Amino acid sequence: MAEITASLVKELRERTGAGMMECKKALVEANGDIELAIDNMRKSGQAKAAKKAGRVAAEGVILARIAEGHGVLVEMNCETDFVAKDAGFLSLANAVADYAVANKGVTIEALQAQFEEQRAALVAKIGENMTIRRVAEIEGKVIAQYLHGAKIGVLVAGEGSADELKKVAMHVAASKPEFVNPEDVSADVVEHERQIQIDIAINSGKPKEIAEKMVEGRMKKFTGEVSLTGQAFVMDPSQTVGSYLKSVNTSVANFIRLEVGEGIEKVEADFAAEVAAMQKV
């Protein structure tokens, strides 16, 4: 049986809003598989929805560069917010971003190798580990960028007004869509959600035939919620992003979004009380 760690329980709590013991029980039943635990909790009504994985615990910066129909986002991490504001750290991060946009198609491995000497020297000087973690690229006729405090970076590519695309980039930063259009949602994602919704309806007492019919409406809502053009526009919730784009004669072909520390978790010392409580049951 998989080990159910305190950090795993904590992540499940953060993503579902359920109680500590409910989360521990769900993880035990799912043999430590957090995604399966979330699915089971949704089906049983313990969790109405779950936040996407992406524990943001690392420090660092996201930088953006755009040049001739090509844009890049680069993430560079460090251990503390103090170092994230250090002139030497920011100088290296900016050099990495400049190199990335000038060398289309560069891999993260190539970036790391190119700047390893400078990185190692800075680590020795400051005494804190740091890494060039991610690079993401986008191409398009018009590209707009939005950086939120150097912690979230978004690039949106499309046609039309750069100013309007920047507004959309701000929306992407806030709302975290996963796809551009509802029809872009992959079949496996749709089927996975469909089965969850059918189980939820059946568990509420509905016959399978009725449950399956009910789910069709829910699926349309689901694909709209996870797609950019189907979401309510943050600057005008009375209309969708898609409707707004049509009104300003602008379209989106693609977007990329990076947030500092996504998927990285630091060991936390303030979880001891809950760990102790877990051991008593």
Swiss-Prot record:
Keyword annotations of the record: Cytoplasm, Elongation factor, Protein biosynthesis
The protein's predominant localisation is: cytoplasm
Instruction: Tell me the domain of life.
Output: Bacteria
**Does Cytoplasm show up as a keyword for this record?**
yes
Question: InterPro entries, alphabetically?
Answer: EF-Ts_dimer_sf, Transl_elong_EFTs/EF1B, Transl_elong_EFTs/EF1B_dimer, Transl_elong_Ts_CS, UBA-like_sf
Q: Where is this region: Involved in Mg(2+) ion dislocation from EF-Tu?
A: 80-83
Subcellular localization, as worded in the UniProt entry:
Cytoplasm
Signal peptide limits: none
What molecular functions are annotated in GO for this chain? translation elongation factor activity
Keyword Phosphoprotein, does the record have it?
no
Q: Which GO terms describe its cellular component?
A: cytoplasm
What function does this protein fulfil?
A: Associates with the EF-Tu.GDP complex and induces the exchange of GDP to GTP. It remains bound to the aminoacyl-tRNA.EF-Tu.GTP complex up to the GTP hydrolysis stage on the ribosome.
Under the heading NCBIfam families, the entry gives:
tsf
**Entry similarity comment:** Belongs to the EF-Ts family.
Name of the protein in its database record: Elongation factor Ts
- Organism, scientific name: Mannheimia succiniciproducens (strain KCTC 0769BP / MBEL55E)
